[in-house]
């Protein structure tokens, strides 16, 4: 930290030193939550645990904190707890769920296998959501430890599952739990198993939790066990809660504040965003301010190839379309921040024979979209539009697949293209917000709008698709 602590940071440091209360820091975009955590850590005299959202953040934090502060992610913490409970080294199999499903399908009568594989995405999505929010099948001996019901799982899925899905998901989740007890786990098990089933939690005088708004119910269950006798400091921004679709609790911060009787402190002075940028998001976050005047908001215009520039969009299809147009025009692009590249390629490959003509492929996309929408899919229109982008550029499905593979392998370009979800935690000098008017005003979409609009350090430009 190169600047003098702000009055807000001073107030937090005073609270840390002068009381034993649990604290929740509401840190707006670019408002120094990381530097504040480092400041807090530097004042501590006893051992502490810092829990970070992902591995890269944890690795960076580990270089900055005291030697007596342990830095973990929820996954690495859970892995060590489950390994200690298990008593020997665990086997981490990232394809565990697919292996279980394949064995299950292979044991079924041959006449049923095609149908079972058609349910693969629905079943595995349900199992992963179940493990994120804490569902245990009623048929399991430890079902009483569940913190979610099947209805909770269904409510959070992208589409309404067919009636057969619950029975298959329950059977395979029971098999997955049994494998975890035998020592074979995947990444979801690292949190699910120690959160709900068993394990001895380490004890620290102080536990600091970063990105609190992104905690899932099973993360919250881990925190409850971890902080039985510990002081807790949480940091997050409820306006940046955008991961409900993968199991995060949209009320994680308010729920924790009540459960742990936490005193709330603000961090509302942005070091990243100049005044024009912070004023622009007062419609959602009226308390955010900037340490510096300046910045600018623009509407319309073409992409300017300045250094440190990003194009960000709530939806993938407009992003893919513009990235492809930019690539064709001769400008190198970086689409590593597009969420669904591998999924789009997989969906294209499933449309039918690669010899399908453009017209036939477009018909297949329409049929796929109609089928998904009949199940109330929230993402089918965006996925279908992504596929249409590639099919419309070529004569055959084979050409569309090749086009998609070429685009999604572009990761070292002059302009970065990112979805709103993938842009979280990043910052750029110049940001183009593509098709902002298409963002809904319900659910977590306003939060995504805010996240995108607070990535720039200098300029924010709103642009529209040509289509």
Language-model features: locations:
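Conserved helicase C-terminal RecA-like lobe
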Residues: 349-467
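Accessory N-terminal region flanking or inserted into the helicase ATPase core
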Residues: 2-14, 22-24, 36, 111-208, ...
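P-loop NTPase Walker
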Residues: 1-89, 282
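Conserved P-loop NTPase-based nucleic-acid remodeling module centered on helicase motor cores
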Residues: 55-130, 327-344
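Conserved helicase motor core of SF1/SF2 NTP-dependent helicases
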Residues: 26-37, 43, 53-56, 213-300, ...
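Flexible, surface-exposed loop/gating regions in the mature catalytic domains
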Residues: 174-176, 180-181, 186-197, 208, ...
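The start of beta-strands in P-loop NTPase/AAA+ ATPase cores
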Residues: 49, 68, 205-206, 232, ...
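A polyampholytic, Gly/Pro-enriched intrinsically disordered region
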Residues: 87-106, 258, 284-291, 349-373
């Amino acid at each position: 930290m190169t600047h003098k602590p702000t009055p807000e940071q001073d107030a937090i440091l005073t609270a840390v030193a002068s009381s034993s209360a649990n604290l929740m820091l509401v840190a707006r975009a670019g408002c120094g939550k990381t530097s504040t955590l480092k400041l807090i850590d530097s004042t501590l005299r006893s051992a502490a645990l810092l829990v970070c959202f992902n591995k890269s953040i944890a690795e960076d934090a580990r270089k900055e904190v005291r030697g007596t502060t342990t830095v973990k992610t929820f996954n690495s913490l859970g892995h060590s707890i489950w390994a200690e409970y298990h008593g020997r080294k665990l086997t981490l199999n990232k394809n565990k769920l697919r292996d279980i499903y394949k064995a299950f399908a292979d044991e079924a009568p041959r006449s049923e296998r095609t149908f079972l594989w058609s349910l693969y995405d629905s079943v595995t999505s349900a199992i992963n959501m179940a493990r994120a929010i804490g569902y245990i099948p009623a048929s399991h001996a430890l079902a009483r430890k569940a913190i979610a019901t099947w209805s909770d799982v269904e409510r959070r899925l992208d589409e309404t599952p067919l009636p057969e899905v619950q029975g298959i998901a329950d059977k395979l989740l029971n098999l997955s739990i049994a494998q975890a007890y035998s020592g074979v786990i995947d990444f979801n098990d690292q949190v699910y198993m120690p959160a709900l089933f068993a394990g001895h939690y380490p004890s620290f005088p102080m536990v600091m939790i970063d990105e609190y708004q992104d905690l899932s119910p099973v993360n919250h269950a881990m925190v409850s066990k971890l902080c039985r006798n510990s002081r807790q400091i949480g940091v997050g921004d409820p306006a940046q809660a955008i991961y409900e679709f993968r199991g995060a609790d949209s009320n994680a911060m308010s729920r924790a504040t009540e459960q742990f009787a936490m005193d709330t402190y603000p961090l509302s002075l942005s070091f990243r965003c100049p005044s024009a940028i912070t004023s622009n998001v007062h419609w959602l976050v009226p308390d955010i301010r900037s340490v510096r005047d300046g910045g600018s908001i623009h509407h319309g215009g073409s992409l300017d190839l300045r250094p440190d520039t990003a194009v960000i969009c709530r939806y993938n299809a407009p992003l893919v379309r513009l990235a492809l147009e930019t690539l064709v025009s001769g400008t190198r692009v970086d689409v590593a921040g597009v969420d669904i590249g591998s999924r789009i390629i997989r969906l294209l490959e499933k449309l039918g024979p690669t010899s399908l003509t453009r017209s036939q492929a477009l018909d297949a996309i329409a049929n796929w979209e109609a089928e998904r929408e009949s199940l109330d899919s929230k993402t089918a229109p965006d996925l279908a539009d992504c596929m249409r982008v590639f099919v419309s550029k070529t004569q055959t499905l084979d050409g569309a697949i090749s086009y998609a593979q070429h685009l999604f392998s572009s990761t070292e370009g002059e302009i970065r293209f990112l979805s709103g979800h993938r842009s979280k935690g990043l910052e750029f000098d110049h940001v183009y917000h593509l098709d902002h008017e298409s963002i809904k005003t319900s659910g977590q979409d306003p939060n995504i709008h805010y996240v995108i609009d607070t990535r720039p350090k200098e300029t924010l430009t709103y642009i529209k698709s040509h289509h």
